[in-house]
Amino acid sequence: YYASRGLGDVYKRQAFHMSNRMHPDYYVYDMITDILSNGRSSRFIQSLVQEQKLFTSIDAYISGSLDEGLLHVTGKPVEGVSLEQAEKAIWKELEKMKTVPVSEQELEKVKNRYESEQIFNNINYLNVATNLAFFELTGKAEDINEEVGKYRAVTAEQIQATSARCFVPENCSILYYKAIS
């Protein structure tokens, strides 16, 4: 789908269907997006921004609650890079997630980052209250204490298998924003 907007730039968004927040795969999807785009050493930043210089910015993130969610990939191609070229490069990186296992070092780095973010987030009482309210909504307030363990339990094999199920054209909706001339 193509949309035009008067902001003078080009933008690409892909959305893949994924599980809801209470499904065990939710943690796998979250780790996948962290591997792809969380930090300067993430795959998208290293390959698509720094090495190939195809994007000025690119991100992968999940949205989901009690309903089924989406795994989003959004990016702004460098001027002169076509949307088709940008899309092809993203699919190539997603294909690697399906075919090449994540290294233990890369997986441990993402797990450590998540755990440290949780520790720092729990310093703020508002964050704790918000998270506790969400888990109370699900009927399992005590699950708030299990989050880090659920992320720590994610394996490279789960990441590869979930990527293989998720990153297929039939599971993807694509939106291109084109600048109005």
Residue ranges, per PLM feature:
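Short, conserved catalytic/metal-binding micro-motifs enriched in Asp/Glu and His
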Residues: 30, 159, 174
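Single conserved hydrophobic/aromatic residue that forms the stacking wall/gate
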Residues: 1-11
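Extracellular/periplasmic catalytic domains that process cell-envelope and extracellular macromolecules
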Residues: 166-168
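M16 family metallopeptidases and their MPP-like homologs
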Residues: 12-19, 46-99, 104-153, 170-179
